[in-house]
Amino acid sequence: MTKKILFCATVDYHFKAFHLPYFKWFKQMGWEVHVAANGQTKLPYVDEKFSIPIRRSPFDPQNLAVYRQLKKVIDTYEYDIVHCHTPVGGVLARLAARQARRHGTKVLYTAHGFHFCKGAPMKNWLLYYPVEKWLSAYTDCLITINEEDYIRAKGLQRPGGRTQKIHGIGVNTERFRPVSPIEQQRLREKHGFREDDFILVYPAELNLNKNQKQLIEAAALLKEKIPSLRLVFAGEGAMEHTYQTLAEKLGASAHVCFYGFCSDIHELIQLADVSVASSIREGLGMNVLEGMAAEQPAIATDNRGHREIIRDGENGFLIKIGDSAAFARRIEQLYHKPELCRKLGQEGRKTALRFSEARTVEEMADIYSAYMDMDTKEKSV
């Protein structure tokens, strides 16, 4: 009988963006791959896809019906492994798999960044920490992507459960690679930028946590010192109008580009001079790693995810959250020192290779194998 795995997350785009290599790996192993998530995105390597309207808010009453749908799917298909991602998807899937787990289904959860962390609001600790502590009883393996979360997870895990740390979800270092000056210029022309523009790129959803406000304020401080500065936001989100209004208010509209969704994000990164990130909370910082893979120097806010990949002054710079002036100073420093840009970029590429897709697939294969090689299902309490 063919073995089956169910991947669950809040939205299906999460899988398209980050998990296709793992789907492919399971197919190569002869497994059936099923997906449960909100959305209509077509996903390769998937045998069954369940469009389940999981809500992002843990307080949305519709998630009760979602729980019932998920439980029906899990109980019907008798999965060997259920691997869940994202906070709400992870909660609902683990609750829905409790009965199946008693019959041998193994449940894995990847925390892409706990909402409770150093510096997080007290409400995050009061809400998310007790829930994760409770759910650890229904989790066979808790997987983390940064050191702070790994240490925290070891304190959460119940006897019999495993805690693992991997090098993120994997950067495609072939797609995100350095390009020649000629190719960079071609990409700039293709995407509507000038040859002499000094381009900073930040691919991220426009929201409060990604904190684009700090970058806009930094750009406003540099608008006269670096007239060719272009700060490019690749993404959409609820804060787009607010951030556009802020750029206008600070007189920086000519220097801030709201690019919107970009299907060729690797090209937007390759045409840039510097990779930037201003998030308050980050699990790892894939956008920073993608910039590093393309040999872009990185400037990012000092949080647990960015600290995992940036060594201040060696492969990039870390900036205190909220300190727009410090961000501006580092941008200006790189503008005036192209040799420093090259040095940081080369070191960044070395860092990105340690977080490559090939390495993380290998790490996850080791984790999965512990549950795939069982001849008979071992029942969980």
Curated annotation (Swiss-Prot):
The enzyme's E.C. designation: 2.4.-.-
Origin: domain of life: Bacteria
One Pfam short name: Glycos_transf_1
A GO biological process held by the record: polysaccharide biosynthetic process
Keywords recorded for this protein, A-Z: Exopolysaccharide synthesis, Glycosyltransferase, Transferase
Family: Belongs to the glycosyltransferase group 1 family. Glycosyltransferase 4 subfamily.
Protein function: May be involved in the production of the exopolysaccharide (EPS) component of the extracellular matrix during biofilm formation. EPS is responsible for the adhesion of chains of cells into bundles. Required for biofilm maintenance.
Protein name, as recorded: Putative glycosyltransferase EpsD
Species assigned in the record: Bacillus subtilis (strain 168)
